């Protein structure tokens, strides 16, 4: 697996961001783009802060994720500037002095107190598009998040630069390292909490550094789509293991899911293999010009074919889709955009001017409705689950005869299956970012 050096790609990435910012400012009628990194938030009636989360608009420009009270200023025709907050503080570790592949491209101003930024920001706040959260306000510099600017920038974030793709490949490698450690822990009989800790140790990131909370689900827990409880006692017997977990690389996320059967549970292992084969066909369908909504509908038909083959449903895949039976077994979307955010922005945008492309009727949880374009990175994450609440709704709707309930009873103790890769849409064939990382890790 060939890894590109993101440092060598950064200058071109920055040039793209500058062009986008210039166009966005023109759309909104502003002279300056001002992006605060964000501030620490404190728990109510307490002096403890929540884990800091950097403004995604900030980390699009810089590979910095732990620099609160800093700012980026872009003015067309000038070098971008960074106002870098490096306080005098003996209570906490302060950010290291600016270094790395990005520093030569910016005018850098070090400040020791947040209010020192006021003298370095553009003179007239009314001429600034300030992108951030309300808590980032400093004096008269209050985030206004003008829609023409935000819509333009978020739409074009859907197309990743080579620099971004290089970092996303790094995040795949880290995530796969954790997935391998987690599977090994499962095979050794570990509980969910211990599996989670093995994952974090292998990745080298704690829960606050990971892009989202790990889903580590044994047996029936896999039927809870976002199960994050991390049980301290392994169930007996161990039947199945679903893990949905990623990693971060300089602010870019990976989002990977795998499902495993315990030794001796051959029929469930066969169903996992069938879902995996179907998922690979879905990944291959990621092509420019293909409507992601159609990919989602096609996924329903493919997954219902798996259930038909395993005797779980009695009707055709098309009938299962039309009657809502398929939604009981596959109740989420096929995936989403990913990049700086796990659920990256503008998944429903009609254009860089805004607007919204609605989800297809009957599919309320799909997170992406756009037509695929080169440079987009999407997740492909089909799943099959045995969720009593949803299956009871099928009965209540009068479609219980479509399901073989004995087969449901057989598979219910396994919870469910989900397989998830990240796929880059290119000018030609789909580029799966996840599978090569697993292949390299497996030697």
Curated annotation (Swiss-Prot):
Top EC class of this enzyme: hydrolase
The protein's Enzyme Commission number: 3.4.13.9
SUPFAM superfamilies, A to Z: Creatinase/aminopeptidase (SSF55920)
GO MF annotation: an example: metal ion binding
Annotated Gene Ontology cellular component terms: cytosol
Cofactor annotation remark: Binds 2 manganese ions per subunit.
UniProt xrefs under PANTHER family: XAA-PRO AMINOPEPTIDASE 3 (PTHR43226), XAA-PRO DIPEPTIDASE (PTHR43226:SF8)
Protein name: Xaa-Pro dipeptidase
Species: Stenotrophomonas maltophilia (strain K279a)
